[in-house]
Swiss-Prot record:
Family according to the record: Belongs to the CWC16 family.
UniProt feature coiled coil, ranges: 182-215
Designated name of the protein: Probable splicing factor YJU2B
GO biological process, one term: mRNA splicing, via spliceosome
Superkingdom as given in the UniProt entry: Eukaryota
Region feature Disordered, mapped onto this chain: 1-26, 256-385
Localization, UniProt: Nucleus
Biased segments, Polar residues type: 260-270, 307-316, 359-373
Record function comment: May be involved in mRNA splicing.
Annotated source species: Rattus norvegicus
Keywords: Coiled coil, Nucleus, Phosphoprotein
Main localization of the protein described in the UniProt heading: nucleus
InterPro entries registered for this protein in UniProt: Saf4/Yju2
Length: 385
């Protein structure tokens, strides 16, 4: 492309190299085009880069280091034989113009107008940096022997202070000097780590296939290993320890039972029996009779009453005496009828035994609340009968 650019220039028919010399003179233009529009005033348009952070005086905005501007470059003086240049540029955030110039004596840039520097400088002596030797000091070192001796002593003391730091830097550089050995060590460590990761992945895959798991497994940690070691599925005591404990317990056990044991067991048994007897006992006289609850026994269905029983019942009824009888006559009458009453009682017992249904007794008749008594609830109205 370079040679093609030089060969592909258009030369008009009236171009005369002896008269015009170059195409720029033929077109009456400068090679830098618009950048050289103020070249007659000694000003050249260049691309200037901000050397440090500043604050614009017009808009009070921060302009960072490295921001580029189209600046007017102009020579304003010399430092010995080094020229001093000034740069004038417009702020990209406002209409303010900023002027800066070089400082060859301090190897720095100085703000002339339009901005203020963000102070981030430090002293080179405090930072233990190498300072540039001034021209007057160089001449004095060359001509004055005493000054050169004093300067040498100061340099040696500075070297003693900086020697540990320099040796540490040198050791660090020597450690990383052999690139091949470092690369081999790094690759070997990488291969070992990769192999361990592959083995761990194979174990995880085998466990997932065995337990039919579809979730990713988290890598183990030291806390997990300690917890798993505490949760093993075996007892704390071995078989021999258990047998030894059993033998010791048997040896120290008393041969005779304690006095409180049988009494307590018998008392418990008696309390249980008492509760059962209470549950089987019939209710007391305060409880209502079956007739009061509307429960009657149906005698006609269970067994027909014999005529002998009816006759005995009629005989057992006490005859009413005439109204003129006395108590003495009643006693005489009772003594005479004593054998008759005994006969009537026996006949009543026989009748009751005949009238009772199968599986029932006389106690069931006297206590109808027992489960053996066959009771039927009669809900019919007494008046209707």
């Amino acid at each position: 492309m370079g040679e093609r650019k030089g060969q592909n220039k258009y030369y008009p028919p009236d171009f005369n190299p002896e008269k015009h010399g170059s195409l720029n003179r033929y077109h009456n233009s400068h090679p830098l085009r618009e950048r050289a529009r103020k070249l007659s005033q000694g000003i050249l348009i260049i691309r200037f880069e901000m050397p440090y952070n500043i604050w614009c005086d017009g808009c009070k905005n921060h302009i960072g280091m490295g921001v580029r501007y189209n600046a007017e470059k102009k020579k304003v003086g010399n430092y010995y034989t080094t020229p001093i240049y000034r740069f004038r540029m417009k702020c990209h955030l406002c209409v303010n113009y900023i002027e800066m110039q070089t400082d060859p004596a301090n190897c720095d840039y100085v703000i002339v107008s339009g901005a203020s520097r963000k102070e981030e400088r430090w002293d080179m002596e405090d930072n233990e940096q190498v300072l540039t030797t001034e021209h007057e000091k160089k001449e004095k070192l060359e001509t004055d022997a005493m000054f050169r001796l004093e300067h040498g002593e100061a340099d040696r003391s500075t070297l003693k202070k900086a020697l540990p730091t320099l040796s540490h830097i040198q050791e660090a550089q020597n450690a990383w000097k052999d690139d091949f050995a470092l690369n081999s060590m790094l690759r070997r460590h990488f291969r070992e780590k990769k192999k361990a990761m592959q083995e761990e992945e194979e174990k995880d895959q085998a466990l997932q296939a065995k337990a039919n798991l579809a979730i990713p497994l988290v890598p183990e940690s030291e806390d997990d290993r300690r917890l798993a070691a505490l949760l093993r599925l075996h007892t704390l005591d071995s078989y021999e320890d258990k047998q030894r404990m059993k033998r010791t317990e048997i040896i120290h056990r008393s041969w005779f039972p304690s006095a409180q044991g049988p009494s307590t067991s018998s008392s418990k048994a008696s309390t249980v029996l008492k509760k059962l007897c209470r549950g089987r006992r019939p209710p007391t006289g305060s409880a209502g009779a079956p007739g009061d609850l509307g429960i009657v026994r149906r005698k006609s269905r269970e067994a027909p009453e014999s005529p002998q029983c009816t006759a005995d019942n009629s005989l057992s009824e006490e005859p009413r005496g005439p109204p003129g009888t006395t108590p003495d006559s009643k006693t005489l009458q009772g003594t005479a009828e004593a054998p008759r009453t005994s006969k009537t009682l026996e006949s009543k017992r026989n009748c009751s035994d005949q009238a009772l249904p199968l599986g029932s007794s006389q106690e069931d008749l006297l206590h109808p609340n027992t489960p053996n008594a066959s009771l039927v609830a009669d809900y019919s109205d007494s008046e209707s009968e």
